[in-house]
Regions:
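Active-site- or binding-pocket-proximal scaffold segments within functional domains
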Residues: 1-167
Length: 167
C-alpha cells in the first residue's frame, strides 16, 4: 500500500530549535506516493491529483497543534482539519463523534509557552518560515496558513511575525 496524500500540520508559534519542522515536497526521495488514479485509471479522490502533499500552518506550539495541554481547543481545530481531509479521501467517520470533536475546537484557545517548565531546556530559536523553505530547497508554492490563524488575528489575538508580514 502506498500513501495517496500526505498531510503535515505545522505549529506556527513553536520557537524551540528541536521542534523546527521538516517540510516536504514531491521531489523528496524518501516520499513514495501512490499514483492518485485508482486501479481503473479514475481519480480515487479528485482533489488529490491537485495537492498530494498538503502542509498547513496552525496557530500554537507543538502540543497546541497535536494536543496535550489542558485546553486543547487549538488541537481540536487541527484535528477537525485532519478529519475533513480524511473524509474527502473516502474515510467514513461516525457523524456523532465527528460532530462532538468539531464542537471542541476553539481557534481562540490560549497558545501555551513551550519553553515553560522543562521546555525551558530546549534551545530557543525563533522560526523564520521563509528561511525554512529556502534551507530545504523546497518548491512548495505559497505557504498555507489555516484560516483559523487569520480569524484569531481579526479577533485581536497576537500573530506570528511571519504572518503579520503577509497582512
Amino acid at each position: 500500500l502506498k500513501t495517496r496524500q500526505l498531510l503535515l500540520l505545522i505549529a506556527l508559534d513553536d520557537e524551540r530549535n528541536t521542534f523546527h519542522p521538516r517540510l516536504w515536497n514531491d521531489a523528496d526521495d524518501c516520499i513514495d506516493l501512490a499514483d492518485p488514479r485508482g486501479r481503473d485509471g479514475q481519480p480515487v479522490a479528485p482533489h488529490i491529483q491537485h495537492e498530494r502533499i498538503s502542509q498547513l500552518w496552525f496557530a500554537g506550539v507543538h502540543s497546541n497543534v497535536g494536543g496535550g495541554y489542558p485546553d486543547d481547543g487549538l488541537a481540536h481545530v487541527a484535528l477537525g482539519w485532519i478529519m475533513d481531509q480524511a473524509e474527502l479521501n473516502g474515510l467514513r467517520l461516525e457523524p456523532q463523534i465527528r460532530d462532538e470533536l468539531h464542537a471542541l475546537a476553539d481557534e481562540n484557545a490560549p497558545i501555551y509557552d513551550s519553553r515553560h517548565g522543562l521546555g525551558g531546556y530546549y534551545r530557543y530559536n525563533p522560526r523564520r518560515i521563509e528561511a525554512l523553505v529556502r534551507l530545504n530547497k523546497l518548491r512548495i508554492g505559497p505557504v498555507k496558513v489555516h484560516e483559523s490563524v487569520m480569524r484569531r488575528i481579526r479577533a485581536g489575538q497576537r500573530a506570528h511575525a511571519a504572518v503579520e508580514q503577509l497582512l
